Regions:
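Domain-level signature for soluble enzymes in the chorismate/prephenate branch of the shikimate pathway
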Residues: 1-255
Length: 255
């Protein structure tokens, strides 16, 4: 079994859960091997180089309608901090298909920035006096954070719904992956903000240092993210897919 994971801070609770989950060591090692950014995992999934994984919501559209998607994803309500559109020349982010599509759905103009790079950008914008503010990106030719939009907030303003940025989908081993995600949801507990998965200091700190943020900021960021897909999140996905059809935006394909 080959499971792919998005290598961002927002999936750290799942990583911690998986470490203590009763399954084979070979499966766990495969999960650590198949880690990358969303757009790369989309290709891995579409070409069946992985059996399952957390992939972009737009790439999971077929899985959504074919009952090949689990009830867990990477979800934000009102704010996300790590999916931004910067006031700059229009530019897509090579790491994400969903966020690029969402930018078009929301009629936003600017440069799309996602993941830990976007989180660092947001952090720097809130700490403009910090000496560590030295964001660099090939899309943007300046270091000083400019005005930007949080796409989860823009989506909420438009629909009143949360947004599902990524989703756990599978090709094979349906029962195993459904049980895995069901156990993950059960471990998390009830409510958006409550997480039954406690992240140890020694696991969190390497991410904090790598991104260039504080532990407090990282903890607050994770409070903006939740994972369980229920009726409202399912409706948000269906609405997003409807907007894609209206806008003529195609989901990623193998060829």
């Amino acid at each position: 079994m080959r499971f792919g994971k998005i290598e961002y801070l927002n999936l750290l609770p799942f990583d911690v859960f998986l470490k203590g989950y009763r399954t084979s060591n070979s499966f766990k090692s495969t999960c650590n091997y198949k880690k990358s950014y969303p757009a790369k995992l989309n290709k891995e999934f579409l070409f069946r180089r992985i059996d399952a994984g957390f992939i972009s919501s737009i790439a999971g559209m077929n899985a959504h309608y074919k009952a090949k998607a689990c009830k867990a994803g990477i979800i934000a309500y009102k704010e996300v901090w790590s999916v931004l559109v910067l006031e700059s020349s229009p530019a897509s982010d090579y790491q994400s298909a969903t966020s690029n599509a969402l930018c078009l759905v929301l009629d936003l103009k600017g440069a799309v920035l996602i993941g830990d790079r976007a989180l660092k950008y947001h952090y720097d914008s809130k700490h403009t006096n910090s000496k560590s503010s030295h964001f660099q990106n090939s899309t943007l030719k300046h270091n000083k954070p400019s005005k930007y939009y949080d796409m989860a907030k823009c989506w909420y303003d438009k629909t009143g719904l949360p947004f599902v940025f990524g989703r756990a989908c599978f090709h094979t081993n349906d029962t195993f992956y459904k049980n895995l995600i069901q156990d993950f949801n059960h471990k998390l507990g009830q409510g958006k903000r409550y997480k039954g998965v406690k992240i140890p200091h020694y696991i969190l700190m390497p991410y904090v240092k790598k991104i260039g943020i504080t532990k407090t900021f990282a903890t607050k960021y994770l409070e903006h993210i939740y994972y369980k897909i229920e009726a409202k999140e399912h409706h948000a996905l269906t609405l997003f897919y409807r907007y894609l059809r209206i806008k003529g935006i195609k989901a990623p394909k193998r060829f």
